[in-house]
Regions:
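Extracellular beta-solenoid/beta-roll
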Residues: 186-188, 251, 324-327, 360, ...
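Short loop/turn motifs at secondary-structure junctions and domain boundaries
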Residues: 2-5, 531
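Fold-core signature of tandem repeat domains
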Residues: 63, 74, 80-85, 102-104, ...
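Short N-terminal segments immediately surrounding and downstream of signal-peptide cleavage
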Residues: 54-71
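Outer membrane beta-barrel translocator domains of Type V secretion systems
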Residues: 613-691
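Intrinsically disordered, low-complexity Ser/Thr- and acidic-rich flexible linkers and loops
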Residues: 92-96, 192-202, 491-499
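Gram-negative bacterial Sec-dependent N-terminal signal peptides
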Residues: 4-5, 9-51
Length: 691
């Protein structure tokens, strides 16, 4: 597909045919084609045996209706109305090698034209086309003026140097290319972004290498501004987007998206509710205003200066970006690995990377502060609804809704953390978290060798993940979820699916002085295929009270269940005089494997065990008896054919069979010894046949 940046056309008198012939010229960096080249082109045209029909609409003349096809040319010095054009693009869109179509000269006017498959309308300098509909692969090449053009279903408009398109509407799969020196004003874009935000799609929508002004981008619409392009006063609604490689000025995002790529520049963008401005590495923006529920994202290597962040506006960035501006605290800055006075709310997030730092950070409702290991954040204020993401290798200190908190990245000790709303903290090996509160959508993760002290409180919707043996010297209060995990067995992680039988599984222990259940759950792994191994909860010297649900995932062979022996599989171990209340634990869901059901039992030693039931699962005898019962029924059905009453006539016969009875088998030794299980059933059938 050829879309040359500068193609111009002129009429030349052909003395051989005695007619005007259209000649195209390309303005390239090396200059125009020579007159010899034009002459050769005309000579080639005159050598065609059958010449296309050319008509000329003279100045002052008006032509109403008509169709152009088969490489016909219509040269318009006067005016036309209601023409249909279906020729001129047989050799590809906007190619100078094409012949045929409608040519609107200086002073010529074409109105209400329909350009359809393979059709081409060429509007030369000084010519005007109005109310044109271009569809099904037709195109309009513009060096003059086009007003109120509609592009439908692969309809294309090419605005060349000196050309002006105003009021163009680009519908599904339509395409407008504004080339260097071209101008498009008042364009409405309804296509180009069907593949998703910032997707690789340059075959529909508006491509700007020249200038686009006062553009409206609706849902599914896209405007791409190339490096030579400028877009001014663009309005983008939800579901529409703008890709900036050149310059975008005075853009308003009413739920729409603006993506500023490397070497792109956007100035004076206003981000309203639902809108995003994304500044990628090497991109730059200036004087952006973030209003409530709007969002500015600045990637590492991106730059945003003179930003105005109003209340409820979100800033998403990291200490590898450059951002300066004002917020409700005053002046703020991010750059050179340091952040100061940043406000995070309503989806905002600041990532403090290794070796970088942040100070005076306000994490308000919906905001997130993430501090990597080796990063440092001081004077942090986290209000209710704010989130902190860190591990014991980070250094963080400040206040939250519960009071003062701190993380010492050197010692690995943390105190007074409040984790909620997507916040998380990881206690690495050798680290310690004391007096931790995990709220709704908060996560506390402990590596092997991590430990807890004081009171660890898990609210409803909170999670604690154990990746190894963990010891708590204090109390655990659980209204959320505690999950034993195994980083080497993704099959069993998070999803609680049954792990592959050959997956390596390492079982872990959680040891705590006291456990108070508040309707929370502990998710444990168990092998029911004979190894009798399980994760284990150890109550050391204290007590287990309240109500805790135990949920087990069988990580052994899911088809093989083995009867337990002795006391069963110990899952709760009360040590050093610890006690467990009757009813402190219960199964959250049935546990089955192979032929067995398993139950949770408390023994006199205060420990809790999984045991297989003496009776097989109800499905086992049913499955074992199905074959015998089916064979009995088949024999009965076959024998029934001998018990029929019939009526015969010369041309037809009717047969009726009615039968009922009882089928059953006595217990003759039990299915454990291979016998058919005891079963009993009745049957009845009526069969009517005719031919």
């Amino acid at each position: 597909m050829k879309r040359h940046l500068n193609t111009s056309y002129r009429l030349v008198w052909n003395h051989i045919t005695g007619t005007l012939v259209v000649a195209s010229e390309l303005a390239r960096s090396r200059g125009k084609r020579t007159g010899v080249a034009v002459a050769l082109s005309l000579a080639a045209v005159t050598s065609v045996p059958a010449l296309a029909a050319d008509t000329v609409v003279q100045a002052g003349e008006t032509v109403n209706g008509g169709t152009l096809a088969n490489h016909d040319n219509q040269i318009v010095f006067g005016s036309t109305n209601g023409m249909t054009i279906s020729t001129g693009l047989e050799l590809g869109p906007d190619s100078e090698e094409n012949t045929g179509g409608q040519w609107i000269q200086n002073g010529g006017i074409a109105g209400n034209t329909t350009v359809t498959t393979n059709g081409r309308q060429v509007v030369l300098e000084g010519g005007t086309a109005s109310d044109t509909v271009i569809r099904d692969g037709g195109g309009q090449s513009l060096n003059g003026l086009a007003v109120n053009t509609t592009l439908n279903n692969r309809g294309e408009q090419w605005v060349h140097e000196g050309g002006v398109a105003t009021g163009t509407i680009i519908n599904r799969d339509g395409y407008q290319s504004v080339k260097s020196g071209g101008l498009a004003t008042g364009t409405i874009i309804n296509t180009g972004a069907e593949g998703g935000p910032d997707s690789e799609n340059v075959s529909s929508g508006q491509m700007v290498g020249g200038t686009a002004e006062s553009t409206t981008i609706n849902k599914n619409g896209r405007q791409v501004i190339w490096s030579s392009g400028v877009a001014r006063d663009t309005l983008i609604y939800a579901g529409g987007d703008q890709t900036v490689h050149g310059h975008a000025l005075n853009t308003t995002l009413n739920g729409g998206y603006q993506y500023v790529h490397k070497d792109g520049l956007a100035l004076n963008t206003v981000i309203n509710e639902g809108g995003w401005q994304v500044v990628k590495a090497g991109g730059a923006v200036g004087n952006t205003t973030i209003n409530q529920n709007g969002e500015l994202r600045v990637h590492a290597g991106g730059e945003a200066t003179a930003v105005t962040q109003n209340t409820g506006g979100a800033l998403v960035t990291s200490t590898a970006a450059t951002v300066t501006g004002t917020n409700r605290l005053g002046h703020f800055s991010v750059g050179n690995g340091m952040a100061d006075n940043v406000v995070l709310e309503n989806g905002g997030r600041l990532d403090v990377l290794e070796g970088h730092s942040a100070q005076n950070t306000l994490v308000d409702d919906g905001g997130t502060l993430a501090v990597s290991a080796g990063g440092k954040a001081t004077d942090v204020t986290i209000t209710s609804g704010g989130a902190l993401i860190a591990d014991s290798g980070a250094t963080v200190e400040g206040t939250n809704a519960s009071g003062k908190f701190s993380i010492d990245g050197i010692s690995g000790q943390a105190s007074g953390l409040l984790l909620e709303n997507g916040g998380s903290f990881t206690v690495n090996a050798g680290g310690l978290a004391s007096n931790t509160t995990v709220g709704h959508r908060g996560t506390l993760t402990l590596a092997a060798g991590g430990s807890l002290s004081g009171r660890t409180q898990l609210s409803k919707g909170a999670s604690m993940v154990l990746n190894g043996d963990v010891v708590s010297t204090g109390d655990i209060v659980n209204a959320g979820e505690i999950r034993f995990d195994n980083q080497t067995t993704p099959d069993a992680a998070l999803s609680r699916a049954v792990a592959k039988s050959n997956s390596p599984v390492t079982f872990h222990k959680l040891t705590t002085s006291n456990l108070t259940g508040q309707g929370g759950t502990i998710n444990m792994r168990v092998s029911l295929d004979g190894s009798n191994a399980s994760d284990q909860l150890v109550i050391n010297g204290g007590q287990a009270t309240g109500k805790t649900w135990l949920a087990f995932t069988n990580v052994g062979n899911s088809n093989l269940g083995v009867a337990t022996t002795g006391q069963g599989i110990r899952v709760v171990d009360a040590q050093n005089g610890a006690t467990t209340e009757e009813g402190a634990f219960a199964l959250s869901r049935p546990l089955q494997a192979g032929a067995f059901n398993y139950t949770l039992n408390r023994d006199s030693d205060e420990d809790w065990y999984l045991r297989s039931e003496n009776a097989y699962r109800a499905e086992v005898p049913l499955y074992a008896s199905m074959l015998t019962q089916a064979m009995d029924y088949d024999r009965t059905l076959a024998n029934s054919r001998s018990h029929q009453t019939g009526i015969n006539s010369e041309n037809n016969s009717v047969r009726l069979s009615i039968q009922g009875g009882h089928l059953g088998h006595d217990n003759s030794g039990g299915i454990a010894r291979g016998a058919t299980p005891e079963s009993s059933g009745s049957y009845g059938l009526v069969r009517l046949e005719g031919d």
